[in-house]
């Protein structure tokens, strides 16, 4: 199965670029599943319902978010109504939406988990405890974990959550931050 993961889409210029390029990338590489972090897709910060619909229409199977997800009020109903837009799973259960979805593909069902790190972020549960609980409930064998965090050290720890069970994408790495060289393969198929 071929995945494309894009993030962090920022403002109108980022949204316009994704709308223009993503369909071509999907075609060129034969992508079977696309995950896009759209939490900053709106020009005013956050993501609106229209932004999410545009990303989904141009090819995003799942849109993940982070701590800015609730900045645009129009996203609230969409979070509750659609399975393609996620907020972090470790937000309080009273928050709109969910942080876990299962999407059917020709290759089987892919479970996507969206998490947010706790450093410099208030009112979120432990991401490791949250993902452990989700894994115990799921019967899926293919997981896609998106983990947005504010500190690079958390990246290494997140790699062990779904070892040999998943694809993992750590988000919130922007081009103006120092290079991390944090890529590593834990075991085959992770």
Descriptions of predicted regions:
Residues 1-190:
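Acidic, metal/ion-coordinating pockets
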